[in-house]
């Protein structure tokens, strides 16, 4: 069968992950198809929906795949650009192709506010959070929290994340975000046990492994220097991760969970997780599980 690795042409944040996926597809005896969302064209007619792609002025070719793995949608510079890339993936799905993660579920899970909103509504433990375009409401949230973390809604790897305990310092950050037409996403800072958090990796409704990411500062992202350590997740950790993926409809994800004196809190969900630190610490390659999940779904 033909398995499409879906991503943009112009950028790749984690090339080793792509290489792992392509190698896994070949090891299972199937063919890799590279699908670039920003080089694709959606065609609508009486015959239905079809998708083509061409690299620049290259030859237009139909996107004919049996299954797809969505990695990410690239550096987004405009709302319409984001929507178009989402609908390119939706068009592939409309052709009857199973894509993991599906475009709409990926869109929700990759948005911090949308993801935690769904989890909070379902009764799962999330940090106290406030999101607004009103900088004075965000200012009041920092005052109320005492110590807070300010993030972008769609950031990753711990970049552009600030810890503040002075609301007036936070106001400078808020002014910058507003100048970029970005909302303010503020969370109460958690005192995490072990100065880190857990990354629980779920594929196809099963926990395949977990790591504890021990931070060197207050951040616990591997991209920020945190040390990944293989752990055996507790039953409660696994249950939280599985419920999270079920609520968000994800076929694969990394679920970040912190342990505090008040219990566990789900920090973020990563539907485009990078797994090199996880693979190094555990010896488990998520790519093989993801590819097998897609193949098994195709063969149903």
PLM-predicted stretches and their roles:
Residues 219-266, 288-300:
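A long amphipathic alpha-helix within ATP-dependent nucleotide-binding catalytic cores
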Residues 119-120, 142-159, 182-193:
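ATP-grasp fold ATP-binding core
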Residues 159-244:
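Phosphate-binding site of ATP-dependent enzymes
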Residues 1-4:
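Extreme N-terminal starter segment of soluble prokaryotic enzymes
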Residues 10-126:
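Conserved N-proximal alpha/beta basic substrate-recognition cap immediately N-terminal to
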Residues 270-282:
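Glycine-rich phosphate/pyrophosphate-binding beta-alpha loops
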């Amino acid at each position: 069968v033909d398995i499409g690795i879906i991503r943009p042409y112009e950028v790749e944040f984690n090339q080793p992950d792509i290489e792992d996926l392509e190698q896994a597809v070949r090891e299972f005896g199937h063919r890799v198809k590279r699908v670039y969302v920003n080089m694709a064209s959606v065609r609508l007619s009486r015959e239905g929906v079809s998708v083509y792609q061409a690299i620049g002025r290259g030859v237009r070719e139909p996107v004919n795949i049996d299954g797809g793995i969505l990695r990410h949608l690239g550096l987004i510079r405009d709302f319409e650009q984001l929507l178009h890339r989402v609908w390119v993936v939706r068009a592939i799905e409309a052709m009857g192709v199973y894509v993991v993660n599906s475009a709409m579920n990926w869109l929700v899970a990759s948005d911090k506010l949308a993801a935690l909103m769904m989890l909070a509504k379902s009764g799962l433990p999330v940090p106290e959070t406030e999101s607004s375009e009103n900088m004075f409401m965000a200012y009041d949230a920092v005052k109320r929290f005492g110590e807070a973390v300010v993030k972008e809604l769609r950031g990753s790897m711990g970049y552009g994340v600030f810890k503040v305990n002075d609301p007036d310092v936070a106001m400078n950050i808020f002014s910058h975000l507003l100048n970029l037409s970005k909302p303010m996403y503020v969370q109460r800072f958690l005192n995490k046990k072990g100065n880190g958090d857990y990354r629980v990796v779920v594929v196809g409704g099963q926990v395949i492994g977990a790591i504890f990411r021990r931070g060197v500062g207050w951040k616990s992202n591997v991209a920020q220097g945190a040390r990944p350590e293989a752990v055996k997740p507790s039953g409660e950790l696994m249950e939280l991760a599985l419920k999270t993926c079920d609520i968000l409809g994800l076929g694969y994800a990394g679920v970040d969970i912190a342990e505090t004196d008040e219990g566990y809190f789900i920090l973020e969900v990563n539907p485009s997780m990078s797994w090199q630190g996880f693979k190094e610490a555990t010896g488990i390659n998520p790519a093989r599980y993801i590819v097998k999940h897609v193949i098994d779904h195709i063969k149903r």
